[in-house]
Swiss-Prot record:
Gene3D superfamilies per UniProt: Ribonuclease H-like superfamily/Ribonuclease H (3.30.420.10)
GO biological process: DNA recombination; DNA repair
Gene for this chain: ruvC
GO MF, one example: magnesium ion binding
Annotated compartments: Cytoplasm
Cofactor: Mg(2+)
Originating organism: Halothermothrix orenii (strain H 168 / OCM 544 / DSM 9562)
Protein name: Crossover junction endodeoxyribonuclease RuvC
Domain of life: Bacteria
Length: 165
């Protein structure tokens, strides 16, 4: 199963493609979609959508896992992330991908074993679980890898116990 994990944002979208076979993960690719701050929001969203469609077409993932929007004290940031999530979800839906969403707490729990783990703890676990030489940068990319791992673990358990992801 090939999983496309996405950490949404307007400035930087982290993405990661991993293959899960049994209890093992293999990294296919990861990176970021960066949008220039000088552009209007609508143009930045267009870049995100176009690039996400291209990534989906290139790698043909089986499923998509996206971080859920959590309440942010900065309303402007929350709106921008929500808009980015919208075009990301649209790209996945247009490709007829099964889309799963996970909260930051669920991702931390699945990857580090503790829902309140610090970002650095999650990043070290991502590095270890995927046998990477270093923690991927920027943080958004490491987060996308963590989201992919979270889905791989959660999907396996949900299939076993018949619960909804």
């Amino acid at each position: 199963m090939v999983i496309l994990g996405v950490d949404p944002g307007l400035a930087i979208v982290g993405y990661a493609l991993i293959e899960k076979q049994g209890n093992k993960y293999r990294v296919i690719d990861y990176g970021s979609i960066n949008t220039p701050s000088k552009l209007e929001s609508v143009d930045r969203l267009k870049i995100i959508h176009t690039d996400m469609v291209n990534i989906i077409n290139k790698y043909n993932p089986d499923q998509m896992a996206v971080e859920k929007l959590f309440f942010n004290k900065n309303v402007k940031t929350a709106i921008e992330v929500g808009q980015a999530r919208g075009v990301i979800l649209l790209a996945g839906s247009q490709a007829r991908l099964k889309i799963y969403e996970y909260t930051p707490l669920q991702v931390k729990q699945a990857v580090a074993g503790y829902g309140r783990a610090h970002k650095s703890q999650v990043q070290r676990m991502v590095k270890a679980l995927l046998n990477l030489n270093e923690i991927p940068k920027p943080d958004d990319v490491a987060d996308a890898l963590a989201i992919s791992i979270c889905h791989g673990n959660s999907y396996r358990l949900n299939r076993k116990w018949g619960t909804k992801g």
